[in-house]
């Protein structure tokens, strides 16, 4: 295979603000090499990037992040306190996840790490 996933980019009217929020959530560093028009979060092998778009595409996300947490309930509480919005709590006793939105309205999901790894 010749492709390597390097970055996931999100359009937003506020790249710096959204990058700062995500960096605080995933423990990454904000890198701003283009004076605020394209801002990256470095927090592991795949970077998150945020680029200026004054009119993001309306409607449901066609792509979203799936994250895992060792303590799902505590992590969801922390994200909500940090400004995430709750969309839905989903799943059953075998696999639970929560769909949230970041401050710009982009959906993402958080699942229990142990349950997610058991399903792989």
Q: Could you tell me what each predicted segment is?
A:
Residues 14-29, 75-81:
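Amphipathic alpha-helical segments
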Residues 2-12, 32, 40-42, 46-51, 55-79, 96-101, ...:
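Vicinal oxygen chelate
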Residues 36:
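Short, Lys/Arg-rich nucleic-acid/phosphate-binding segment
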């Amino acid at each position: 295979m010749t492709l390597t996933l390097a970055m996931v980019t999100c359009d937003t009217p506020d790249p710096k603000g959204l990058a700062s929020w995500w960096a605080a959530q995933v423990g990454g560093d904000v890198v701003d090499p283009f004076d605020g028009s394209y801002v990256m979060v470095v927090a592991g092998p795949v970077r998150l990037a945020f680029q200026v778009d004054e009119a993001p595409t309306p409607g449901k996300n066609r792509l979203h992040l799936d994250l895992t947490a060792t303590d799902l309930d505590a992590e969801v509480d922390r994200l909500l306190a940090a400004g995430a919005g709750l969309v839905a709590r989903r799943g059953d006793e075998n696999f639970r996840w929560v769909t949230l939105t970041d401050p710009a309205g982009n959906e993402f999901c958080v699942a229990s790490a142990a349950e997610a790894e058991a399903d792989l």
